[in-house]
Protein backbone atom coordinates (compact mmCIF):
# COMPACT_ATOMS: atom_id res chain seq x y z
CA UNK A 1 0.00 0.00 0.00
CA UNK A 2 2.81 2.42 0.81
CA UNK A 3 4.45 1.66 -2.53
CA UNK A 4 1.26 2.61 -4.45
CA UNK A 5 1.02 5.81 -2.44
CA UNK A 6 4.66 6.72 -3.18
CA UNK A 7 4.18 6.01 -6.92
CA UNK A 8 0.97 8.09 -7.04
CA UNK A 9 2.59 11.05 -5.25
CA UNK A 10 5.66 10.81 -7.50
CA UNK A 11 3.44 10.79 -10.59
CA UNK A 12 1.52 13.85 -9.34
CA UNK A 13 4.74 15.73 -8.60
CA UNK A 14 6.20 14.87 -12.02
CA UNK A 15 3.05 15.99 -13.86
CA UNK A 16 2.88 19.23 -11.84
CA UNK A 17 6.54 19.92 -12.65
CA UNK A 18 5.95 19.21 -16.36
CA UNK A 19 2.96 21.57 -16.38
CA UNK A 20 4.97 24.33 -14.69
CA UNK A 21 7.80 23.91 -17.24
CA UNK A 22 5.27 24.08 -20.09
CA UNK A 23 3.69 27.22 -18.61
CA UNK A 24 7.14 28.82 -18.23
CA UNK A 25 7.92 28.13 -21.90
CA UNK A 26 4.56 29.57 -22.99
CA UNK A 27 5.00 32.71 -20.90
CA UNK A 28 8.52 33.19 -22.32
CA UNK A 29 7.27 32.87 -25.89
CA UNK A 30 4.40 35.28 -25.15
CA UNK A 31 6.88 37.73 -23.64
CA UNK A 32 9.09 37.44 -26.74
CA UNK A 33 6.10 38.15 -28.98
CA UNK A 34 5.15 41.19 -26.89
CA UNK A 35 8.73 42.49 -26.95
CA UNK A 36 8.86 42.05 -30.72
CA UNK A 37 5.55 43.89 -31.14
CA UNK A 38 6.72 46.75 -28.93
CA UNK A 39 9.98 47.00 -30.91
CA UNK A 40 7.97 47.18 -34.13
CA UNK A 41 5.74 49.90 -32.65
CA UNK A 42 8.78 51.89 -31.54
CA UNK A 43 10.33 51.51 -34.99
CA UNK A 44 7.05 52.57 -36.59
CA UNK A 45 6.85 55.70 -34.46
CA UNK A 46 10.50 56.47 -35.13
CA UNK A 47 9.96 55.95 -38.85
CA UNK A 48 6.98 58.33 -38.87
CA UNK A 49 8.90 61.00 -36.96
CA UNK A 50 11.93 60.52 -39.17
CA UNK A 51 9.71 60.72 -42.26
CA UNK A 52 8.22 64.02 -41.10
CA UNK A 53 11.61 65.49 -40.30
CA UNK A 54 12.98 64.19 -43.58
CA UNK A 55 10.13 65.77 -45.55
CA UNK A 56 10.59 69.10 -43.80
CA UNK A 57 14.34 69.03 -44.37
CA UNK A 58 13.93 68.07 -48.01
CA UNK A 59 11.58 71.01 -48.53
CA UNK A 60 13.95 73.42 -46.81
CA UNK A 61 16.94 72.07 -48.69
CA UNK A 62 15.15 72.28 -52.04
CA UNK A 63 14.26 75.89 -51.28
CA UNK A 64 17.86 76.68 -50.39
CA UNK A 65 19.09 74.87 -53.48
CA UNK A 66 16.72 76.82 -55.70
CA UNK A 67 17.94 80.13 -54.27
CA UNK A 68 21.55 79.17 -55.00
CA UNK A 69 20.77 77.61 -58.40
CA UNK A 70 19.96 80.98 -59.95
CA UNK A 71 22.88 83.31 -60.60
CA UNK A 72 26.63 82.99 -60.24
CA UNK A 73 28.10 81.17 -57.29
CA UNK A 74 31.33 81.60 -55.43
CA UNK A 75 33.54 78.63 -54.57
CA UNK A 76 32.16 78.64 -51.02
CA UNK A 77 28.57 78.62 -52.27
CA UNK A 78 29.47 75.81 -54.66
CA UNK A 79 30.80 73.80 -51.71
CA UNK A 80 27.57 74.50 -49.80
CA UNK A 81 25.58 73.21 -52.79
CA UNK A 82 27.68 70.02 -52.86
CA UNK A 83 26.94 69.48 -49.18
CA UNK A 84 23.22 70.08 -49.75
CA UNK A 85 23.21 67.52 -52.56
CA UNK A 86 24.98 64.99 -50.31
CA UNK A 87 22.44 65.60 -47.55
CA UNK A 88 19.59 65.12 -50.03
CA UNK A 89 21.07 61.77 -51.11
CA UNK A 90 21.41 60.70 -47.47
CA UNK A 91 17.81 61.67 -46.78
CA UNK A 92 16.63 59.74 -49.82
CA UNK A 93 18.45 56.64 -48.57
CA UNK A 94 16.40 56.79 -45.35
CA UNK A 95 13.10 56.10 -47.13
CA UNK A 96 12.68 52.55 -45.82
CA UNK A 97 14.89 52.13 -42.73
CA UNK A 98 12.61 49.57 -41.04
CA UNK A 99 12.62 47.18 -43.99
CA UNK A 100 16.38 47.50 -44.39
CA UNK A 101 16.95 46.88 -40.70
CA UNK A 102 14.69 43.82 -40.71
CA UNK A 103 16.32 42.42 -43.83
CA UNK A 104 19.82 42.85 -42.39
CA UNK A 105 19.05 41.49 -38.93
CA UNK A 106 16.76 38.50 -39.43
CA UNK A 107 19.16 36.10 -37.71
CA UNK A 108 19.83 38.22 -34.60
CA UNK A 109 17.95 38.07 -31.32
CA UNK A 110 15.72 40.94 -30.20
CA UNK A 111 18.33 42.77 -28.11
CA UNK A 112 20.84 42.70 -30.95
CA UNK A 113 18.16 44.01 -33.33
CA UNK A 114 17.36 46.95 -31.05
CA UNK A 115 21.05 47.77 -30.58
CA UNK A 116 21.81 47.50 -34.30
CA UNK A 117 18.85 49.69 -35.27
CA UNK A 118 19.88 52.35 -32.77
CA UNK A 119 23.52 52.25 -33.94
CA UNK A 120 22.41 52.48 -37.56
CA UNK A 121 20.20 55.51 -36.83
CA UNK A 122 23.08 57.22 -35.02
CA UNK A 123 25.50 56.36 -37.84
CA UNK A 124 23.21 57.83 -40.49
CA UNK A 125 21.61 60.71 -38.62
CA UNK A 126 24.76 62.01 -36.90
CA UNK A 127 26.59 63.09 -40.06
CA UNK A 128 23.37 64.26 -41.71
CA UNK A 129 22.44 66.51 -38.81
CA UNK A 130 25.98 67.87 -38.44
CA UNK A 131 26.17 68.57 -42.18
CA UNK A 132 22.80 70.33 -42.12
CA UNK A 133 23.92 72.38 -39.11
CA UNK A 134 27.13 73.35 -40.87
CA UNK A 135 25.34 74.25 -44.08
CA UNK A 136 22.70 76.33 -42.31
CA UNK A 137 25.36 78.00 -40.17
CA UNK A 138 27.35 78.88 -43.28
CA UNK A 139 24.27 80.21 -45.02
CA UNK A 140 23.29 82.35 -42.07
CA UNK A 141 26.85 83.65 -41.85
CA UNK A 142 26.80 84.52 -45.56
CA UNK A 143 23.38 86.14 -45.38
CA UNK A 144 24.11 88.06 -42.18
Curated annotation (Swiss-Prot):
Leucine amide: residues carrying this PTM: 143
Cleavable signal peptide: 1-18
A Pfam family per the record: Bombinin
Propiece residue ranges: 19-43, 74-123
UniProt site (Important for flexibility): 59
Highest taxon listed in the record's lineage: Eukaryota
A GO cellular component annotation in the UniProt record: extracellular region
Secreted is among the record's keywords: yes
Keywords recorded for this protein, A-Z: Amidation, Amphibian defense peptide, Antibiotic, Antimicrobial, Cleavage on pair of basic residues, Cytolysis, Fungicide, Secreted, Signal, Toxin
Modified residues annotated as Asparagine amide in this record: 70
Gene Ontology MF: a single term: toxin activity
Membership in a protein family: Belongs to the bombinin family.
Protein name: Maximins 1/H1
Source organism of this protein record: Bombina maxima
